[in-house]
């Protein structure tokens, strides 16, 4: 392959060693041509090899080996020698094809390719429209309309198989009548956005179709989870390298894990003997905390009456003095205080409880401190905002949902525990068909016995892939942007007569809570009658909003307050123009109320 005649570009370096990569002899250009003539993946391999290897003979040998290996790839390989023919769409009559005609059916390769190309086309069209602001957030229909069936779309299940043509119609219509939660004008929930890297990770996760209980069947995913959880514990600020954690089906289950861990830590006999073997235990949480704490109290046998609610100030933060008073009151009544939940980012107000002061009280009375940072945990990634979670490193356990502020696709929630071994001890049942101690690898990587589930979905890959793609700094920028948009919204409406803030001062999180005041109620003194009328405003606007499909934002009451809008921003695709649109849309829909 090599030429003995130097090219004009290299003639001035004729005395140099031609076997080094400091020069670009004609052979180098020849190899680059070979690389460019190959499929993309193979070409990248060759180019990477050219950058690393100095020997001309070795380069020639390896290029030939690559091409020989390439010739052995089958039809479905992404490295087929003809890039254009790999997955070329052809006219296919899906009305006469059924699931049984796809792989693993004999000669099912072509039908499988064509069917999946149609599905990918549906998916890509949906993704494109999701980021198109001229597309509606939703095409709203009432439940009875969908249950009765739309044209070509029927939810009822049949005894006999339907054609792939109908299956493709069902795929399109399912997305059509759903809500575009990735739309830049969807502000209804804490989990929003459509991250493309995360989407790719979720595709591949489903393709792998494995389970997280043992290293044996999910080796790479188990290691990814271990590495990611370790990184999250470091970000929390735990110096103990032997902490623990697991990904769970959501923040409610993560919070339940924290209560189970606390109970096992102080009363391990509960695992075998039940609640009858322990004293009358009580839990403490704020009146603004997530309802999952009370739900866990019910599910775990404490009873909701033994989940004691702590008063909050006007911003929705725990009042530490009330916490201590209620701990003392419980002790005086013969109860045993066990656990305190502090919230970092409440669901409605976005408030951050004073963790340092709560931690002092927990240390004083030897209580387990859990921080529910499902919503606010993402702020730990931001050097500008992580101070709002000051003291979180003193917690015994933390819930952190990357599927909220970090924009990871649902579901992705972690329960992190400072002390290693508690999750295992609490939940381990040593099922012999899964967790054999004499396997050929280190069985400490079999994490399934930490979980209350048996089968556990792979939630880690999309998150790990996003972290690789963005880096910690990318997440930081994304989170800072969302908080800046919340500040923009607050500044835009705080002094306008059409709007009234639910509480004074700038928001701590991206939660901006406000009332829209229609013309008929402006300047009207506060009274029960005015509050009753105001209570009906947000639901009416929300109903009109859903009918028009232009945007979505949530509303709710809080305590004795009338229904108000709770705006939350977690979608990095949102911009100031989307905030402006929301304000204008609320005014437009509410002008005649």
UniProtKB/Swiss-Prot annotation:
GO terms for biological process: cellular response to hypoxia; cellular response to serotonin; gamma-aminobutyric acid biosynthetic process; glutamate catabolic process; locomotory exploration behavior; positive regulation of locomotion involved in locomotory behavior; response to auditory stimulus; response to caloric restriction. It catalyses: L-glutamate + H(+) = 4-aminobutanoate + CO2. Residues 1-22 are annotated as: Disordered. One of its GO terms (molecular function) is glutamate decarboxylase activity. Residues 1-12 have a biased composition (Low complexity). 4-aminobutanoate binds at residues 189-191, 566. Its EC number is 4.1.1.15. The modification N6-(pyridoxal phosphate)lysine is found at residue 404. The gene is Gad1. Expressed in brain and pancreatic islets. The modification Phosphoserine is found at residue 77. Catalyzes the synthesis of the inhibitory neurotransmitter gamma-aminobutyric acid (GABA) with pyridoxal 5'-phosphate as cofactor. Keywords: Decarboxylase, Lyase, Neurotransmitter biosynthesis, Phosphoprotein, Pyridoxal phosphate. The keyword Kinase does not apply. Homodimer. Belongs to the group II decarboxylase family. This is Glutamate decarboxylase 1. GO terms for cellular component: axon; axon terminus; cell cortex; cytoplasm; GABA-ergic synapse; inhibitory synapse; neuron projection terminus; neuronal cell body. Gene3D superfamilies: 3.90.1150.170, Type I PLP-dependent aspartate aminotransferase-like (Major domain) (3.40.640.10). Its cofactor is pyridoxal 5'-phosphate. It comes from Rattus norvegicus. The lineage of its organism: Eukaryota, Metazoa, Chordata, Craniata, Vertebrata.
